[in-house]
Amino acid sequence: MARILIVEDEEAIRSALAENLRLEGYEVEEAGDGIEASRKLETEPIDFLILDLMLPEKSGTDVLKELREKGSKIPVLVLTARDREVDKVLLLELGADDYVTKPFSFAEVLARIKALLRRTIFSEGDSSPRTVNIGSAEVDFGAFTLKKNDKVYNLSPLEAGMLKLMLEKRGKAVTREEFLRKVWGYSILPDTRTVDFHILKLRRLLEDDPANPQVIITVHGVGYRMA
């Protein structure tokens, strides 16, 4: 099982997450501040990071920025306070893979961890093509990469799964609830805004002008569709 580092200065939240994840079979490391987090990321093999941005000693923002600057691609789930406006663009630029708002349920966190750690988006016997052209980009679902203008970008399993679902239903709207059920694997749906967060990232990769999308189209009141 994956080794998860939980970085959270509120001991009650950190301990509860750690205990529940251990019961699920994960190896868990804990850190209560940003300096300890950076040290553990440097010295221990970590497969997944749960990171609160508001930390003592060194902010979670700095921890994440340094992690990505060093080339690490481990999945990062950010914890944010519900009463704070989530700056999705900032999270994208920092390299976050997903976020949850406090208070959250353990089931929601666990579903996101499993979705981000998924190694493949293809089921046994799936004959879908592994490489597909979308607009002016080439997506390799086997390698989780997107190539555009001679630049190659990494996709998370969630983002690759979202693209695959929209391609399967090309021209038809995919609801936020459908994304969460089929890509995230939720049975009980949380706040659907996390879908919009990932659509924002995909548009920044696929669209020539993300503010005027021509590839991933918003269907108001419903969800999104692939043009």
Where are these regions (language model features)?
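Hydrophobic residues on short alpha-helical segments
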Residues: 75, 163-164, 180, 200
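N-terminal/domain-start alpha-helical segments
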Residues: 1-124
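Short alpha-helical elements of helix-turn-helix
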Residues: 61, 89, 111, 157-160, ...
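Short, Lys/Arg-enriched segments at the junction into DNA-binding effector domains
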Residues: 3, 115-173, 177
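Short helix-to-turn junction characteristic of helix-turn-helix DNA-binding domains
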Residues: 41, 166-170, 183
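Flexible coil/turn residues that form the inter-helical turn or adjacent wing/linker of helix-turn-helix
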Residues: 72, 172, 188
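Short coil-to-helix segment of the ABC ATPase nucleotide-binding domain corresponding to the Q-loop/switch region
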Residues: 107, 172-183
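DNA-binding patch around the recognition helix
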Residues: 129-130, 154, 199, 203-227
